[in-house]
Amino acid sequence: MDYADTWQAMIDHTQQRTRETPDEIWLLQHPPIYTQGIAGKAEHLLAPGNIPVIRTDRGGQITYHGPGQLIAYLLLDLRRRQLGVRELVRKMENTVINLLQSYLICAQSRIDAPGVYVKDAKIASLGLRVRRGACYHGIALNVAMDLSPFDAINPCGFPGLRITQTSELGIAASIDILEKKLVENFLVQLNSMQTNKEESLS
């Protein structure tokens, strides 16, 4: 699905939200494209070749999207959920960590660089934008894709950062299966948060 069209659809959805608008998760894949976050610096784009580059409004630096990468866009009313951005980022990271743990893969987050890593290789990127108390953008999990375009950038602004994907880690599950598991794990994270808030008020 075209990145620019999807991005505009997320903006429109967020601008048109009301207090009653349900939260949504959009699952898709993009054609090859580099996206520069609002903190992106030109020096991290080394040799893009014929792959288009678009400057977007999410946080962070430059990354690559392409076929075989699971994209989960989170369109959430943070104000209604009483959820802060830092807490949401932690929930997003834990979603991927727990998903990989179900396949006996040990992954972790990093304080200095949001995302999820297996040893020293990044397997999932995160990006968010908040407007009117609601967020969009989300999680990009590398599943079974051509990783060579990452060689043409400093991924997320880190020169030499290694990139990996589930297919390289012995996970044979298809992207369709991983989509379902990702959503299930994310909903567990959100529901756990809501339960804890309710208990603290009782």
Indicate where each model-derived feature is located.
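Short beta-strand micro-motifs enriched in acidic
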Residues: 129-131
